[in-house]
UniProtKB/Swiss-Prot annotation:
InterPro entries, per database record: His_Pase_superF_clade-1 (IPR013078), His_PPase_superfam (IPR029033), PG/BPGM_mutase_AS (IPR001345), Phosphogly_mut1 (IPR005952)
Pathway noted in the entry: Carbohydrate degradation; glycolysis; pyruvate from D-glyceraldehyde 3-phosphate: step 3/5
Reaction catalysis annotation: (2R)-2-phosphoglycerate = (2R)-3-phosphoglycerate
Naturally occurring in which organism (per UniProt): Borreliella afzelii (strain PKo) (Borrelia afzelii)
Name this polypeptide is given: 2,3-bisphosphoglycerate-dependent phosphoglycerate mutase
Active-site annotation: 9 (tele-phosphohistidine intermediate), 87 (proton donor/acceptor)
GO terms of biological process kind: gluconeogenesis; glycolytic process
Binding site residues for substrate: 8-15, 21-22, 60, 87-90, 98, 114-115, 183-184
Gene Ontology molecular-function annotations: phosphoglycerate mutase activity
Amino acid sequence: MYKLVLVRHGESEWNKENLFTGWTDVKLSDKGVDEAIEAGLLLKQEGYFFDIAFSSLLSRANDTLNIILKELGQSYISVKKTWRLNERHYGALQGLNKSETAAKYGEDKVLIWRRSYDVPPMSLDESDDRHPIKDPRYKYIPKRELPSTECLKDTIARVIPYWIDEIAKEILEGKKVIVAAHGNSLRALVKYLDNLSEEDVLKLNIPTGIPLVYELDKDLNPIKHYYLGDENKIKKAMESVASQGKLR
């Protein structure tokens, strides 16, 4: 049996302000730092050790991972960072308030943009400073691969090949793996692992900063999965994620 640990980054400053973030590189909030520390302490308490870690190219995921590894006393392990684990790109919605956007376009429309499988938000023009072609961290990535907007289907199309080619390979070699990423890149991975339908993934709420453990068989099929921590706290965190994008 293999184990895989997934962690959505701790609350970011834009999570706190209820803004669409996507590929915008924002820092963790104070609460997010505390969530990452708690995640590290939970993993330490349960005796977790890791050989290799994976993360995105965004600070909030990197910082969450670094804090967790520091709490574990495992900052020395190899870390691979890739744009393929970045959050889903929210196009022209990036930087907008979710509740205000719901008031303007309607909750149903915003829910479709946020959670539908194959409907992306309005795209960013390449002249927009928010477009990834303007960001030096992506200068070595072919321009045609950099999104102007994404739906979950698009996110899956970049996450799953990386899972197959890189992450799964390390697990099958017997390495203990932790992945620190984002709500939608992790939803993409969970959909694949659990073979969720497009309808079921719409209802999937992954809370910030709470370790999600997968136990996998020899073929990397899930045996079971579970969150570490207090059940009531986990439930409230999931409800908080589900409530984003609603009128308040």
